[in-house]
Amino acid sequence: MNKRILVTGSSRGIGKAIALALAQAGFDVVVHARSRIDEANHVADEIRALGRRSDVLMFDVTDRERTKQQLEAFIEQHGAFYGVVLNAGLTRDAAFPALLDDDWDQVISTSLDGFYNVLKPIIMPMIQLRKGGRIVTLSSVSGVMGNRGQVNYSAAKAGLIGATKALSLELAKRKITVNCVAPGLIETEMVTEEVKSHALAMIPMQRLGQANEVAGLVRFLCSDEASYITRQVISVNGGMH
């Protein structure tokens, strides 16, 4: 049986790197995007070029009903997922007094409602399949340490760590591992030169991370070799803490 993994937020950046790394490791991958359907389709084409199957789903993880409909319909047609990588996230940075209500709500909802909305329709079919499984969430160094100008993002990502650890306890006896990867500053199109120059002073390795370095860890956590690793938060941050 081919093992299929859903990667949310995988049309670009770290999510795309994760999707391609999993395909290279022999997994079939379902690519997800909120709106960038053309980019998601391109990633799916790259996965198929590697000899793996790939489908594309498009929904906003904060929309509970839409997410449920899309995932339940997919599972009914294709069967349960072997794994899920929760990568979809959102930043809206500002000093706390300047945060807008929507800045708080959207960042929290994308990470925490997204966790619930995506996993709720997926977990029971995974359990019923009795084949074990892998769940990996993407937190952040901000969720581990806190970061000025990111009270909303730090809260969201710290909450994700707590949810990950709690869920791992419920699923361990089902041979479904649940782990969290916490990247530091990773070189993506979202990182400005100003942010980069400020951040380098805080990174002992004196460089930004690369998306493939995060993807390599996620790939390992989804592998058979990681079957005894669960409830862990593993940082990829160049020694920031």
Pin down the residues of each PLM region.
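Substrate-binding pocket helix/loop in short-chain dehydrogenase/reductase
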Residues: 95-96, 100-108, 199
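Conserved glycine-rich cofactor-binding loop
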Residues: 11-13
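Active-site helix of classical SDR
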Residues: 119, 156, 164
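C-terminal substrate-recognition "lid" of short-chain dehydrogenase/reductases
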Residues: 210-239
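Conserved glycine-rich Rossmann-like NAD(P)H-binding loop of the short-chain dehydrogenase/reductase
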Residues: 27-42
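Residue(s) in the substrate-gating loop at a strand-loop-helix junction
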Residues: 140
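Alpha-helical segment proximal to the catalytic Tyr-Lys
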Residues: 124, 169-173, 227
